[in-house]
Amino acid sequence: MAMALVLPATLQADEISDDVTPAEQKENTVDVKEIVFGHIGDSYEWHITTWGNTPVTIPLPIIVYSNRTGWHTFLSSRLEENGGSYEGFHIAPEGSKYEGKLVEQDVAGNEIRPLDISITKVTLALLINSMLLLVIILSVAHWYRKHPQDSAAPGGFIGFMEMFIMMVNDDIIKSCVGPKYRKFAPYLLTAFFFIFINNLMGLVPFFPGGANVTGNIAITMVLALCTFVAVNLFGTKTYWKDIFWPDVPWWLKVPVPMMPFIEFFGIFTKPFALMIRLFANMLAGHMAMLVLTCLIFISASMGPVLNGSLTVASVLFNIFMNALELLVAFIQAYVFTMLSAVFIGLAQEEHKVEVKKQH
């Protein structure tokens, strides 16, 4: 158990050391901002390690469409092989409006963005993690197809997954959505395990892990949009009536529709809160671990005693953060699924009107 916690911290330090040159350590000019944002950001290649002075990377396919020259498809390694530019495209330098993005130049010499559907690091990690999730779910489904319902309870990995699935289904979906939970269970279960798998893989400090998938706001935006569609597309008449004509005093609705406006605004703030909550928590966790690891290299020029002390402290804090991030990986998946289930359940709830009998 101790080795399982120490290993990620050690491998992360080794990975960051690839980005820090001996001259930077000696002069104490380690650019923490560049290292941190380089690791949590997206990229057109996947950096594995550095062998000697040679970075070992996986070049990824670049697929772009230019209004002037049409479609282009090539590996990102072609950019480096041709001095940073290939077929009129290059990576925008630091300080540019499109820093780190693939750009081309128009007839006036200005940088413009082509239609970019390239397979980036986050995209590849998303595909790998989705395939991993698919294999896990299909293996569980295969076991249940082969065994009748009255067979003995499964053990091992299948039993663990059954416990996990039943926990999410019974404790979150069924209790929050209500009687119509079966309609939404497939989406909510998928959302939970998708977020959980991506969170866990983001903590693995070597390929194919380490990509900051759920710390990418585009990913969390799509997840929140799915919940937004599920809530509003399947909302009952009562749900929409409570938005446009809520049960509040009439003077809060006419002549100024203050409460209807607030309720309508809430349609968009709920998924927005889901998006920001997941994005911010996962991004902050990755940044905290990277900054703690950078302390080792920042203190290299401060003498062996101070450097050794800070290294020990940094490793201990990293072990603590890795253990905490394991918990956060589960909690964030749980919270996102629970809030989505609550929002869906509120949109499904029918108000019961009690009629008192007169004697």
Where are these regions (language model features)?
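Cytosolic juxtamembrane amphipathic/interface segments immediately preceding
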Residues: I112-L115, M166-K180
